[in-house]
């Protein structure tokens, strides 16, 4: 090894392929919302046909945003994603405000909420006292941070594994719901007046589709961002659209719209119990926990890159430490530690 190679500063490693990028898109979007959102959309729409239409329109809107992101990603294939795009288009002030919001508000709030929800489901499933909630939440965040600290390739493996595992209960619920369910799907009223307008139902679906844009934050670590990013975003959104619509149809085959609205967040668990017996609810609980791990991993992986990019530009306190890349793992470990620490607080 020459002196030039020894003294060369560490750089982020391009280890993310198409499968890992797809897993980031699907894993960050397909969280607990797949189980929780259908009743909320149904309540807002007031009718099964309009509820399904809301999911379709939400998919179209998300795809429009995804195609826009692809154009920007090909134009600016760098680490930082939307932060970089805002900087290039609107200037450093707008980008700074966006990055500051993600670093100190959105990122910690989202990661902390996901960890808290994981610990709640974990304690409920295994009968653990509630005073262990903070410990379990910290443990799952520490686990995700550790995997991300080992390397982006390992974080990608975890994302693929979590995405595959979370699809198992969703696929089982969808397949057996369509197979064994005998309910009607279209033109069924909830039996109560719609709780909001159709536009609110569409907005509710957009929250379920949210998260796909974060994959652009790791564009600088993709092997070929010009090809991988567009394929991951478009392919991921098409897959997610199919999953959401199929899971809604499956639920309608098992539960009536009025039952879905009345059961609320428990609708998927009750549907699983009808299909698989007493252990059906546990299946959904495990699916939710795996979904949360995938979401946590995706957010720590992508948001830490925004922190890193801001620190490179000396826009954060302690930028010298936050912009450091570990020589062995080629990852911004300190940026991830900051996110997890703020999330726990």
Specify the residue positions occupied by each region the protein language model found.
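Membrane-interface "cap" regions at the ends of multi-pass membrane proteins
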Residues: 1-49, 62-67, 79
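Juxtamembrane helix-boundary/capping and inter-helix hinge elements in multi-pass membrane proteins
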Residues: 43-48, 75-79, 88-94, 220-228, ...
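Helix-loop-helix junctions that connect adjacent transmembrane segments
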Residues: 7-12, 52, 128-132, 160-285
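Select transmembrane alpha-helical segments in multipass membrane proteins
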Residues: 15-25, 60, 91-104, 136-140, ...
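Transmembrane helix-loop junctions in multi-pass membrane proteins
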Residues: 34-40, 115, 147-153, 279-280, ...
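Generic alpha-helical transmembrane segments of integral inner-membrane proteins
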Residues: 56, 60-64, 104, 108, ...
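TM-loop-TM module centered on a large, flexible mid-protein loop between adjacent transmembrane helices
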Residues: 84-85, 91, 123-124, 128, ...
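Hydrophobic transmembrane alpha-helices that form the core helical bundles
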Residues: 40, 53, 63-141, 145-149, ...
């Amino acid at each position: 090894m020459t002196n030039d190679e020894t003294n060369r500063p560490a750089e982020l490693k391009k280890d993310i392929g198409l499968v890992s990028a797809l897993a980031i898109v699907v894993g960050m979007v397909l969280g607990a919302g797949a189980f929780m959102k259908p009743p909320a959309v149904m309540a807002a729409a007031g009718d099964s046909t309009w509820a399904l239409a809301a999911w379709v329109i939400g998919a179209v809107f998300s795809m429009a945003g995804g195609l826009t992101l692809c154009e920007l990603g090909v134009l600016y294939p760098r680490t930082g994603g939307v932060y970089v795009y805002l900087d290039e288009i609107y200037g450093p002030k707008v980008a700074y405000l966006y990055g500051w919001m993600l670093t100190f508000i959105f990122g910690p709030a989202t990661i902390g909420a996901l960890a808290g929800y994981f610990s709640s489901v974990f304690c409920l499933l295994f009968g653990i006292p509630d005073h262990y909630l903070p410990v379990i939440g910290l443990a799952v965040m520490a686990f995700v941070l550790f995997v991300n600290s080992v390397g982006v390739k390992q974080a990608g493996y975890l994302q693929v594994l979590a995405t595959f595992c979370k699809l198992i209960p969703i696929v089982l619920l969808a397949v057996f719901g369509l197979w064994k369910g005998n309910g009607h799907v279209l033109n069924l009223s909830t039996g109560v007046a719609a709780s909001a307008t159709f536009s609110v139902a569409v907005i509710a679906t957009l929250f379920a589709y949210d998260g796909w844009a974060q994959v652009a934050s790791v564009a600088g670590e993709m092997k070929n961002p010009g090809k991988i990013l567009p394929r991951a975003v478009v392919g991921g959104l098409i897959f997610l659209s199919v999953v959401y619509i199929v899971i809604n149809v499956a639920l309608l085959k098992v539960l009536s719209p009025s039952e879905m609205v009345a059961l609320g967040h428990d609708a998927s668990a009750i549907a699983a119990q009808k299909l698989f017996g007493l252990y059906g609810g546990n299946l959904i609980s495990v699916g939710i926990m795996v979904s949360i791990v995938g979401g946590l991993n995706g957010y720590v992986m992508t948001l830490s890159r925004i922190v890193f990019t801001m620190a490179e530009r000396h826009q954060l306190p302690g930028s010298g430490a936050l912009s450091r890349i570990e020589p062995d793992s080629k990852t911004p470990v300190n940026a991830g530690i900051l996110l997890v620490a703020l999330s726990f607080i």
